[in-house]
Amino acid sequence: MDEILYNDNVMIVNDEETSGDVNNQQLISNETIANIQTRLKQLQVSSDSDLEDYINARKMLIEMLNARKEYIPDVLSSLSVERLKSIDLIVQKLNSCEHSIIEHANILDQLQNEITSLKTENEYIVRLNDINAKKAKLFDDFNAKYEDDVGPLYVYAASEDVRQAAIYLSYMMRMIITFENETIESNFIVSDSLYIGDTILNVTISTDLQLGNRTVNVTMDDISESFVILEREYIELYLTRHVHKILNNTISYSTALVIFKRTVEDISIPSQIVNTVLFQQQISNSVTVKDVSKSLVCDFKIDAETELYILLPTIIPDSYSMDILGNQEFMLYLSDLYAFNLLQEILDVLYIDQLEKGLENEDNRAIEQLTLQNAQSIRYILNTLQYVPLYKPYDILIENGILNSIEYAAPLMYIKNEYISKNITRTSDKYTTDRVIGAHVLSGSNMDSLPNTAFKQKLFMNTQSVLTQENPIYEDTDIIIYAVCVISREYDDTICGSGYTYTTSNMYANRSEFIRMNGCIADSVPVKTSTIVKCTYSLIDANRIGLLYNKTRTNIKINQILICFKNSFAVPTSLNVAMDVKIQCLKKTETLSVTQAKPSQILLENGISYFGIICDISFSSDYVFDGNESINFTLQPNTNISGKKELVMYGRQGGGMQISDMFQHKQDSFEYSIKVGLVCNSTQIGMGQWFEIFSTLIQGEFIGNIDTLRESTIRGISNIYDFTDVREFLHEYKISIVKLSIQCLRAMSAGVQDVIVAYSHALSNIDALILDITVEMNDFSNRLTTLEDKVKDIEKWIQNQIDSQNTTIWGSLLDTFVNLIIATALGYATAGIGVLVTKISVAVLSFTSRALTSIARGLQAAGHKVSTLFKLHITQPFLNGAHSLKLLTQKFNAVQGNLTKYERKYITALELSEANNYAAIAKYLKNLNPEIKLAEAINHKLVYSSRYVNPVFKLGNEVMSTVEINYHGLTAIGKLPQLRTPTKKLLSSDFGTTLMKKNKAPAHAYMVITDVDARSEYDLVTKYILGVSEGFTSTTKHVTAGSFKLQYEFRKHPTTNKTTVSFSTYQDTGYTAEEVKLLFNRYFKNRTNITNANQQWELLSSKFMSLQTSTLNSQRFVLPTSHRTTALYEAFKNTRRFDYNLLTNNCQNFCQDSLNWLENGVINGSLIQHSDQLAIKYVNALRGDLSLI
């Protein structure tokens, strides 16, 4: 069958077998064909319907042309060339449209499937968005009501979503009723939208004037109890409710009313529990869902002095002041705050519930796809988190001791054998014995000069040595513990010894010759090349030799135990360390306890840096050779050594002359024994043993080069006892951990660079560091190579969907996944969230290398964002009720010095009441909220570091360093910074927010760094003031950057507990009177009447002691270590020129760059030109911690 290609790609069949069929089709007229052709010419493809008509007409034409092939020449002959070309173009367009239709049909089918899938999956997305929207609205409503940014506390709004959630909540309300004044009827209403149904708690009071007491009647539902209240007594009521969901959309709950009767001392704070009455009412009946949103109204008809306190399940803002609101307003405020927190927990439960349902659906891919779309933002958060101090509890307890203690090197004597011929000395191998420690002795054999001259000088060749060792004594996956041992020896300037006394007359006659040479004639007989000269020798017994030695003192001190945390990048906080160690060394065994423990960055001798704890102990042991002990030894060759040996020498030619060579070849090895004795009883030196005189033999080996250039009577072996590097010789001493207990908060990294944090960037070899990073990144790359292309395809597809749809649903879920990442990084994720983040990790890790470049910027951006959004701090995260205590003490106007007294009593009362299991509610509910946990993690150290203002709140060594950036208004834009009182606008929160987002505000910025050293007697607070135009500025020709410091001592009175503050003198701080004058003139221009340096220093100290009300204070940042603070201060202690530019390099840039250095150790921007000084000062600061060891 032949095929002829027509110009519109139509195939005309030319087959003889079909001719009959064609003839049967000749009834089709030419007119019909012409009409179809006309239709094709006129047809314009402008719509889907036209296109369909065109296709159908074309198909008909093809069929007819195949049936009427004999008419084709007639049709073509009637068409012009131009028309034929036009038809060709139409046909080409037709073909193109056909291909497009096929492609679009496939795409439309794909999109239809995707839309169908998304329609199903968006069921969960819409719910999650709805919950987030409610949170945002509730937060705005609360702020609008109280005009106070207190954090993510939300008002409840009835929603179908709430009814779908599984709720497991317990909460309580506490009322304190006192009767110190006359009875006045008062009415307090507390609304809690979480209570189900209407429950009335009535508290009424009746007074018996004759008996002088009062009766309190408490009624709730069918419960009715009465209490007789005597003078100085009061009652506490705890109304608790546990709500949980059951099947069929019904809710059951249990209610408990707990009443405590207490007595009052000086003020109305619980001091002890006198009588306790506990009764409960259990309600099991079903309550319909529609009652969820009803609220409880409690009418209290009680005295005006009654105080109502609600124990919040989460937190109370630190910024709250009792002076802002009155008594009744305060009650309402706490009530709202309480309700907002609880409702927020419900929304969080709902949120996690919807996530888990979405993940359980195998066909649901929407959450993963949305996560990939937001991968860049999530990576940014992850990289930021790796420098955020995410604190986690760390706890270790060892009570039975560590049996496998490590044995370490200790200083020992060794014998250095020298063969001496004339004045030529060849040194052989060294031999050791652990029988004597620290002696420096020398025999009298082969002395070339008189005693007490060169002999004495040789004794003093090595008279002083100090060695520091960091010996590991414990290691696991989290920590490694080192004992810092300092080994030293000192020599007296006199020579001691009770052995043989040498004089000029007997020095050579009584030498202890070890090798006797016989018949050596090498220097008297000329020899030719290759002439063999032989010399024989024999071994002889050495005489008994008395030893001389310096009076020597060997001392070993162990003053510090270093507890180093692995993979931690900031110092730990909330320390509670107890440690007992048993040390056996130098005839001394002692068990010691750690006397003090402080957090610090630790730099080991090998250059590796850790963050950890330095523990102080005190151990010292000595041994002294004082001349009262006599040491003797003899040398004796073993009997298996032949009597005579032969040395061979070959002549050689040099310079045209035949000269003889020395016998310097290793000819033989000789074994000999050394008998050592010590005139004393056997005793322990650590785990070593001292032997009695001549009690044992020590095997040694002599391999020496014998010089026989000429015969001489001055031959033999000089045997020297000396002290060598302790690393070469092992001696057993032990440090055993008897008991170890560590409780603290440990800073962990949430990023992907944990392996890098153990390096000291200033000290480690940069090539090795780069290699380690490269290996790590290659590992990531190898694991993700096969996934990266797929991830890119998915991201591209999602982006196309975003571009093609008019919706905000994709972008609105960013916060959702950020919260998930944060929750997982903090370790509080549920199983569902864990699965989700596992799916996310492919997208996150595949872009890790690119995202690393944004770490520095991410730190500040995320740190500020979180700190600003969540102004919530946990004063004591492991102590229930600490915030309530703070508010109580403020409410009752307790004096500052007495806070700790009532603090202890209140805590005791809480502990006694923990039997009802409601005291732990706050801990359980707090763990459900990832935002709160992140805020707590970032601001934890901030809370502790702020205690320097009020040291009575300090509960240990968790006081940390902080830095804050303050702002003053400028006199004129573009001029040098001059301080003035800022306007109200400058102090406004809105302006402050704008100021933190930009670096070009009309304000001068400077830094105040506060470092607190918690000592046993007092707290030493050091403030560093740093910035452009700060410090000792004496000229205005150039802009400079400088720093200075002030110090304060906070002391607590042992009996009154009142705290006093004193200023360190300028002399103790390290300044001169002239420097004080420069500083004073800088900050007190108008106080020219004060010229005394002491008075000037006191005014400067007062100015910077606390926050200045005339400045805008930014959010404080907590510093992981104080070493970079010291480096920054030292670098700018002497003012340095600063190339000031208002737009690109101003005072605010300098502060931000300095902050980046303090927090991250990254030098950029305005600090680059000072990088060498900062690095040097930083290393010196690290080394400084070890200098006192």
From Swiss-Prot:
The active site is at H1004, C1147. It is found in: Virion. GO terms for cellular component: viral outer capsid. Its main location: virion. Residues 981-1187 form the PPPDE domain. Keywords: Capsid protein, Outer capsid protein, Virion. One of its GO terms (molecular function) is peptidase activity. InterPro entries: PPPDE_dom. This is Putative structural protein VP1. It comes from Aedes pseudoscutellaris reovirus (isolate France).
